[in-house]
A protein has these predicted regions:
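Surface-exposed loop/turn motifs in large extracellular/passenger domains
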Residues: 23-203, 207-228, 234-259, 266-293, ...
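Gram-negative bacterial Sec-dependent N-terminal signal peptides
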Residues: 1-23
Length: 306
């Protein structure tokens, strides 16, 4: 049975194993489904998200395939394939039987376009064989994954926004015709962990600041391909947090490589105590390659290369 509709889920429920075709999915209470999921959104009709989760709900979608597609034109509000926000909000995408998770955002807009967004303690986990995130915008910034907690002193890990990738293979492509693109953005104590094989293609493969945490191939057992810069960012016009973040990238094995640079960016010059990077760790081992295109002065980057 195929159904095509806007789904608003306000109470705890379980969806049977039938294909769900929807204009968008809104969750404010616990829910689960092992059905194939297909969400197609035309943003010119008003919706700006594919899956929206809030209110502390726990939602598990672990069917054989999950497809989320946003297209069209609009210049109002952020455009997001998936968002999980608020304390205890948890979206589990994919599981043991999931072959493909495809998130595509291809829009004509001047507003930010994002594939997956974990915001203010919201959490997203991703499991399965293949995770593909493709984000393109004509005029706005494009980001594959965005994780932002909006805190500076949170000490409890379960109170931080997070995206945990346990898919076997992940590919993130982010492009914009007239703005910057980022594969992963982790700011204000947001947490991102990518535990399988991963490839990222963007102007900036990682943007980090404000004591965020990024872990790429922490186990050292997977293949990592990065094409783009790693950027420690200062935004005086918004958060004003320091540019430092805890970023670990393990390039291990002959198939792993990074083409790009470590850099910093800012909209205004940060104070000296906010301008140093001490938390970046890069491991290049077992015939992996780092191919920097520009060697930047190390005076602003105190990073460790093993």
């Amino acid at each position: 049975m195929n159904q095509k509709f806007k789904v608003v889920l306000l109470s705890s429920m379980v969806l049977a194993a039938c294909s769900v075709n929807a204009q968008n999915l809104v969750y404010t209470a616990n829910s689960s489904s092992n059905a194939p999921i297909s969400v197609a959104v035309d943003i010119s009709q008003g919706n700006k998200y594919g899956i929206d989760l809030s209110n502390g709900a726990t939602v598990t979608l672990d069917g054989p395939s999950i497809s989320i597609s946003l297209t069209g034109a609009s210049n109002t509000g952020w455009i997001e394939g998936v968002e999980s926000r608020g304390a205890s909000s948890l979206l589990n995408l994919g599981g043991a039987q999931t072959k493909n998770i495809n998130v595509s955002v291809n829009v004509d807009s001047s507003k930010p376009a994002v594939g997956l967004f974990a915001f203010k303690k919201g959490k997203i986990t991703l499991n399965g064989e293949n995770l593909n995130i493709n984000v393109h915008s004509t005029e706005g910034q494009a980001s594959g994954i965005y994780v932002q907690n909006n805190t500076t002193s949170e000490t409890e890990g379960d109170k931080k926004a997070s995206v945990i990738i346990d898919a076997k293979n992940t590919v993130i492509n982010a492009t914009s015709d007239n703005a910057k693109s980022s594969g992963i953005v982790a700011i204000s104590q947001g947490v991102l962990r990518a535990n399988g094989n991963i490839e990222i293609n963007a102007d900036k493969v990682i943007v980090a600041r404000g004591d965020s945490t990024v872990r790429i191939n922490e186990s050292g057992t997977n293949t990592v391909v990065l094409n783009g810069d790693i950027d420690f960012n200062y935004s005086g016009g918004s958060s004003g947090t320091k540019i430092d973040a805890d970023v670990l990238v393990n390039l291990t094995g002959a198939s792993s490589q990074w083409t790009g640079n470590v850099r910093r960016s800012h909209d205004s010059e940060p104070a000296a105590d906010k301008a140093q990077v001490t938390g970046f760790k890069l491991k290049v081992a077992d015939n992996a390659q780092w191919n920097p295109t520009i060697i930047t002065s190390s005076s602003i980057y105190k990073y460790v290369i093993n």
